[in-house]
Structure formats: structure tokens, C-alpha cells
């Protein structure tokens, strides 16, 4: 039976919160801590379903990972002592786990099979398999390169690779494979994509050179890896839902503490500022992964915007809730260059338009994005996350514009990235 959640929340929203740890960084911290021989502590990790799939796989490879209050303690024998798994490595709904481990396991040369849920089975893996095969990885998918992915031992060579899409997952799969090559690998990017893999390689003592659109690895880089402690900042993709909720709900005033504001991920902040939203950053820290507290206040008369190019790449996961924000602008907004949305958990161009249109908003899907007209919540029709966590949370935020409760099917999908999302939203309602 399909689960349903009735969302009955009204504003104003007021108070101070933190959001769960960054999903992208938690995945990478688990992977790197597992490769390094010794003990690493990962503080404030995200323990949603996706990151648990990554943890489960490394446990099968022989890594001891314990949950200790607000941290993970990773005791690893090191990559040289990894076991050959005797069962399929299940990645669930996690594209990050699937694609990054395709590169890492190919580099390790461990015979293994990666497979996920029905959603992962529909997501293309050819964009990862092509560069890995150029590196001489012995990896195959089924039916035109979909999961399961079958990996066999091979000797990885370095490559000079021009990225075909602006994708941090593809880039990271290549980088993880390159750790085990005795050659240099050079990656040329089309556009800036999130750089957590590069910054976290350095944190775990792995040498890497990165300029704006060019990344160069060092031969036999894996030999330099050392265990390290890592503090995971709050996930800006999760914070985005509260940012938009506060902006569109009258009299709201919300502060979110310890949010990661990596410049390759801060598109939501740039977009809100361009639209004239009342947003302030303070308590900023610097370093490999900068953080800040973010204060957001209700802002009427938001300005329309065209979101394209690098701004899309910097806000790719936030675009569904940004589309909702754009419905509250005083003119028509446009999202372009967002073809990548088609290969997420759902085709997010279509699902964003379909679900918001059901509620009375006016969005037109295009081949590479959305045209969004100023519009209001008109009906409390039942909507569906379609098992996409970000669509589910976006619809919950949309309900703030309704005077009636909204029913969302398959809302439990939000647990992929934000267990406790709804209680946190209700907490701000109660404080308001």
C-alpha cells in the first residue's frame, strides 16, 4: 500500500535550526575513511538511507563502522585488506553510491556487482562507464549500460578526459579510479561542478591539483592516504527547503546554523539574492568546506529571474524548490540548461511541473528546464513524491501557501536525505 502524509502546517515560521549533515560530503568521508588504514571520526554525518547504503557496502568489504552519538567511528584495515564480497552490493536509491563506487571498485580491482532499487535501475550509467572503460576498467552494465554493474579485476591507466556533462558524480568516479593508477589523469570540465571530492582528497592527504576547470591527479595517489577526522557541515540542499519556506510565508524569520556554503554549491543563495530575497549570512568560517549561519525573512514582491549556465550547476539539486519560489515572483521566470534534472531520481523537470500544476501553479516544462509564471495555490489535490525525496519536501513547502491540508503520497521518500524533515518544519511553525 502506498504511504500518504497529510501536511497541515501554516505560518509564520520562526526560530533557529540546524539541518542534517551534507549528503555528498558524508558519502565521500565514509569512502575515504574506509580506504585509509586506521581510525577516522566523521562528525555530524547524514544518516539517511542513501549514506547507510554506502556504510553497508564498506562493512561488507571488511571495514568496521560504528555509530557513536553524533559521529561515525571508522576503523579500517586499509584498502589493501579489503575482502572480496560474496553478495551483490546493494546501493538502494543512491546514485552517488552507485556511480562513485563504480570508479572506486574498478580502481581496486575487486570482483563485485553493484545494484540498486527500481529507480537506480532506470538511471543511465553509460556516462560513468565510458570514461572508466577508457581507463581500462573491466566494468559492464546490462541493457545499454544500466545496473547491475559487473566489475572484474583490471589494471587502471591514467587518461586525459574532456567531460561530456557537468556532473560531479562522473568526475568523482574517474577520480576515485585514478587513485589506483600509476599514471597521471587530467580531467577538463565543461562547467564548474561541486568539488567536494577534490577538497576531501586533500583532507585525507591525497595529492591533487585543481584549477577552475582542470583537475590533475598524481600517480599512485592512494599510497598517500591517511586517516582523518572530518566535521560534516549542514547540507545546503536540505537548508534550501527552509530558505524557500521562510521567503514565501508571511511574517517568517528563520535562521539556519552551520550550513555548508561551498562556492560550487551556493547557487540557491545567489538566486535568492538576485530575486531580492531577504537573506543574510553571518558566523562565516573559511577552509576547505566553508560554513555560515543563514537568516531568511519573508519577502513579498520577489523579482523574476533567468537561471542558466553555471548557476544551474551550482543549484542543480535545489531547482525543484527554486521553481516553487519562482511562482511567487512578480513576473515570469525561466530555468534553462538543466537537462541533468532528467536523470535524477525522477525526471525532475516533468515531476516538478506536473505536481505543482496539480496544485494550481503554472509551470511549462521545456526540453532543458521550466518556464514559471506567477501563480498561486488553487486546489488541495492529492500529489505524489513519486519516490523522489526532493519532490516530496518541495511539495510540503508548497503546502504553506494553502489554507487547507495537503495530502502527499510516498512522502516517506524524504528519509533518503532528511529524516526528521517534517518535525523540523513543524517546530518552526510552533515557535512562530
From Swiss-Prot:
One of its GO terms (cellular component) is cytoplasm. The active site is at 317 (proton acceptor). InterPro entries: Enolpyruvate_Tfrase_dom, Enolpyruvate_Tfrase_sf, EPSP_synthase, EPSP_synthase_CS, RNA3'P_cycl/enolpyr_Trfase_a/b. Pathway: Metabolic intermediate biosynthesis; chorismate biosynthesis; chorismate from D-erythrose 4-phosphate and phosphoenolpyruvate: step 6/7. Signal peptide: none annotated. The keyword Transport does not apply. It catalyses: 3-phosphoshikimate + phosphoenolpyruvate = 5-O-(1-carboxyvinyl)-3-phosphoshikimate + phosphate. Keywords: Amino-acid biosynthesis, Aromatic amino acid biosynthesis, Cytoplasm, Transferase. Its EC number is 2.5.1.19. It is an enzyme of class 2 (transferase). 3-phosphoshikimate binds at residues 23-24, 28, 167, 169, 317, 344. Phosphoenolpyruvate binds at residues 23, 95, 123, 169, 348, 390. The keyword Cytoplasm applies. GO terms for biological process: amino acid biosynthetic process; aromatic amino acid family biosynthetic process; chorismate biosynthetic process. GO terms for molecular function: 3-phosphoshikimate 1-carboxyvinyltransferase activity. SUPFAM superfamilies: EPT/RTPC-like. It is found in: Cytoplasm. Catalyzes the transfer of the enolpyruvyl moiety of phosphoenolpyruvate (PEP) to the 5-hydroxyl of shikimate-3-phosphate (S3P) to produce enolpyruvyl shikimate-3-phosphate and inorganic phosphate. Monomer. Belongs to the EPSP synthase family. This is 3-phosphoshikimate 1-carboxyvinyltransferase.
